[in-house]
């Protein structure tokens, strides 16, 4: 039996090595694709191409008796690596006549990411940090674009302290709140103004499939090329007004981060045994715990700034607290029927999204379980 098992495992090892050879060949081809895309200014990520390719491979897998979900999982991971590989090949310069780009806060993580992407796209990039401020007027005197990438609580102050910029200079900020920084930029500069919010962390590796929100400020025709450049990097652009942006971010960021903070605080105060929780956890709880731990591995100032960026955030969090109290009252009353009625009402509100989220979450949970030690 042992000899038979060993022989089969040896065959599996041979197949795995053949897979490695094929993956290496695919990455070589991807590198060539990256060079072509870079030369012609084509975006890294083309959703139609990806969807068509995955649909074809799923059909072919089914015909071979291979689970379609398996080949899709494998290909999605391979494509993620491919996007990172293409990233390193550089990008076409869509505005070759642009004067130097100056990133204020260029030593921060997001500032460094934009410095890297703009550099890969052939632009001259300079950075301006607090120790360089005495030279700010000189550094900014011939800037073609200035990107503000500083902590939220400093954004408006830094914008107000900018020396006069060239009239055609594009002033951009990357803050995760938009209305007040946008108004500050419009007041500080008479030229083109653009508000951006990258909806991802600086450790993403590639901008492929990442969302970048933009809010028009002034003279959008002057920065249209920059939006197109971001699309070439592979990102998905979403346009919204600054006011609507901040209203949505109250849910996406402020409320979510506060709830995560409160849950982490509760775990710490209860002094639970984390190792034991992890050993006993289901995939969904392990994933949730990872998201909580991830928050506390990052900069507390950033999250304090996001959560406390407006009074409307506090009002929303208070309403959440109130509904928590209403839900606890159901438990205190032992009213299962009222609980079920509330559950069904929320289910109806989610509509078809609930079933779609159920399907989407399955793949996330499988992946979380696969990576379990």
From Swiss-Prot:
EC id: 5.4.99.5, 1.3.1.12
Matching PANTHER family: PREPHENATE DEHYDROGENASE, PREPHENATE DEHYDROGENASE [NADP(+)]
Organism of this sequence: Enterobacter agglomerans (Erwinia herbicola)
InterPro entries named among the record's database cross-references: 6-PGluconate_DH-like_C_sf, Chor_mut/prephenate_DH_T, Chorismate_II_sf, CM_dom_sf, CM_II_prokaryot, CM_T, NAD(P)-bd_dom_sf, PDH_C
Biological processes annotated in GO: chorismate metabolic process; tyrosine biosynthetic process
Name of this protein: T-protein
A GO term, aspect molecular function: NAD+ binding
Gene behind the chain: tyrA
Transmembrane segments: none
Any one Gene Ontology cellular component term annotated for this protein: cytoplasm
Listed SUPFAM superfamilies: 6-phosphogluconate dehydrogenase C-terminal domain-like, Chorismate mutase II, NAD(P)-binding Rossmann-fold domains
Pathway recorded for this protein: Amino-acid biosynthesis; L-tyrosine biosynthesis; (4-hydroxyphenyl)pyruvate from prephenate (NAD(+) route): step 1/1; Metabolic intermediate biosynthesis; prephenate biosynthesis; prephenate from chorismate: step 1/1
Family membership: In the C-terminal section; belongs to the prephenate/arogenate dehydrogenase family.
Domain Prephenate/arogenate dehydrogenase per the UniProt entry, residue ranges: 99-361
Domain Chorismate mutase: 1-90
Top-level taxon of the source organism: Bacteria
Record's subcellular location: Cytoplasm
Higher taxonomy: Bacteria, Pseudomonadati, Pseudomonadota, Gammaproteobacteria, Enterobacterales
Keywords: Amino-acid biosynthesis, Aromatic amino acid biosynthesis, Cytoplasm, Isomerase, Multifunctional enzyme, NAD, Oxidoreductase, Tyrosine biosynthesis
Catalytic activity: chorismate = prephenate; prephenate + NAD(+) = 3-(4-hydroxyphenyl)pyruvate + CO2 + NADH
């Amino acid at each position: 039996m042992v000899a038979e098992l060993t022989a089969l495992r040896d065959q599996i090892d041979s197949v795995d090595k053949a897979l490695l050879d094929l993956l290496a060949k695919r990455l070589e081809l991807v590198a060539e694709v990256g060079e072509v895309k870079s030369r012609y200014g084509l975006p890294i990520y083309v959703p139609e191409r990806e969807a068509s390719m995955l649909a074809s491979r799923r059909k072919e897998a089914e015909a071979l008796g291979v689970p379609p979900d398996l080949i899709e999982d494998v290909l999605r991971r391979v494509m993620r690596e491919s996007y990172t590989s293409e990233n390193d090949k550089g990008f076409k310069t869509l505005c070759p006549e642009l004067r130097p780009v100056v990133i204020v806060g260029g030593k921060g993580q997001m500032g460094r990411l934009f410095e890297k992407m703009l550099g890969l796209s052939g632009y001259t990039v300079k950075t301006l940090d607090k120790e360089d401020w005495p030279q700010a007027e000189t550094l900014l005197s011939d800037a073609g674009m200035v990107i503000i990438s500083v902590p939220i609580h400093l954004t408006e102050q830094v914008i107000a302290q900018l020396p006069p910029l060239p009239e055609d200079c594009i002033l951009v900020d990357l803050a995760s709140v938009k209305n007040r920084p946008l108004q500050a930029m419009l007041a500080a500069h008479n030229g083109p103004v653009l508000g951006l919010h990258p909806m991802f962390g600086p450790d993403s590796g590639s901008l492929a499939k990442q969302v970048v929100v933009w809010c028009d400020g002034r003279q959008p025709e002057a920065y249209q090329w920059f939006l197109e450049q971001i699309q070439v990097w592979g990102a998905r652009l979403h346009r919204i007004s600054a006011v609507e942006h901040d209203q949505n971010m109250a849910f996406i960021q402020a409320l979510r981060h506060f709830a995560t903070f409160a849950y982490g605080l509760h775990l710490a105060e209860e002094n639970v045994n984390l190792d034991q929780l992890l050993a006993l956890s289901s995939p969904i709880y392990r994933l949730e715990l990872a998201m909580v731990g991830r928050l506390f591995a990052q900069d507390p100032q950033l999250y304090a700034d996001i959560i406390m960026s407006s009074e409307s955030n506090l009002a929303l969090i208070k309403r959440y607290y109130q509904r928590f109290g209403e839900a606890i009252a159901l438990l205190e009353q032992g009213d299962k029927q009222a609980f079920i009625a509330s559950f069904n009402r929320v289910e109806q509100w989610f509509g078809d999204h609930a079933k779609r989220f159920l399907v989407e979450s399955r793949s996330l949970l499988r992946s979380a379980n696969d990576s379990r030690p």
